[in-house]
Design a protein with these regions (language model features):
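Active-site-proximal loop/helix of nucleotide/amide-processing enzymes and allied scaffolds
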Residues: 1-17, 25, 58-60, 70, ...
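Mobile, glycine- and charge-enriched loop segments
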Residues: 27, 35-77
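Acidic-basic catalytic patches of nuclease active cores, encompassing PD-(D/E)XK
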Residues: 32
Length: 163
């Protein structure tokens, strides 16, 4: 019982967040469920506020870094494409996966979630990078890619950039 309680306290404290981030480097996350399993512990430290993470990928889609991009309130957080572009360029990444949590436990995307996904897809396309997915984590997860929405968004982003 003590081991389980200690593990839970360590998980809630964020102790494992850096371990998760470090151990994911060089790995390929092939499915939204793999992203969910890797990222769920990252949200345990502050599970009562919305936080946004970026999984930055190299040209072979291997994880270069996992970084917290923003934290907000119980129902929202704000991330600026400009700041993410700066990180993509600094890390010399070709793509990324955007991941955030919904403290309510319901992973269904909000209007703001759709809007930031479009803005990020356009911003990344404009510098020759790709937003592979945007995953929302709650009790389960929602993947914009698995829903089919991401492919259409990338097409629209490319069309806008081509103008």
């Amino acid at each position: 019982m003590y081991v389980q309680k200690q593990f839970w306290q360590d998980l809630k404290s964020g102790k494992f967040a850096s371990m998760v981030s470090d151990s994911a480097k060089g790995e390929i996350l092939k499915t939204p469920s793999e992203v969910f399993n890797v990222m769920k512990p990252m949200f345990m430290e502050n599970d009562d506020v919305e936080s946004i993470y970026g999984i930055f990928l190299n040209s072979k889609n291997r994880v270069k870094a996992i970084e917290k991009l923003a934290s907000g309130s119980i129902s929202s957080s704000m991330v600026y494409p400009r700041e993410i572009i700066k990180r993509i360029l600094a890390l010399k990444c070709n793509a990324m996966i955007l991941v955030h949590n919904h403290p309510s436990g319901c992973p269904e995307p909000s209007k703001a979630d759709f809007e930031i996904t479009v803005r990020m897809a356009i911003a990344l396309d404009s510098i020759g990078s790709t937003l592979h997915d945007h995953i929302i984590i709650g009790d389960s997860y929602y993947s914009f890619e698995a829903s089919g929405w991401m492919e259409e968004t990338r097409k629209k982003a490319s069309a806008i950039i081509a103008l």
